[in-house]
Amino acid sequence: MNLDRRKFFDYSVKAIALAYLSMINLFPKANISGDEKKLPWSSNTFKFPLENFKLQSGEILKNAFLLVDVNGELNQSKSNAIIFATCFAGSHKFNQMAYGINRALNPLKYCIITPNLFCSGYSSSPSNTSPLQDGPRFPSVTY
């Protein structure tokens, strides 16, 4: 994705605004009182290793990983899984505003799997990759 300076600035401002909104808890996770540890459903966040991942460009992203957030549990037939990918400037934390008992995605009914996109800062990104591929050396990623 080629970005001129104006588009880069626009995307950066949007990303900062979304990060700020997630920090001030404008969108609470659920209609329950207390801290997040008292959610009435299971919740787990983990790094999913992809090893040396081949991108569409043919470049290899070394030691790639996705940060994955899972809320709810798979049923026995595994038919209740929902993949809820993050947006370009978002994260699993931003997506959590849709989770809850009286919300669009009920983790007591569905298993909501949220992989963070590459370059999100949570999954493999220019800021958390080895010096051989960090910063401006990070491979070009398409979506």
Predicted regions span which residues?
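Primarily extracytoplasmic ectodomains and periplasmic/lumenal surface modules that are beta-strand-rich
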Residues: 73-77
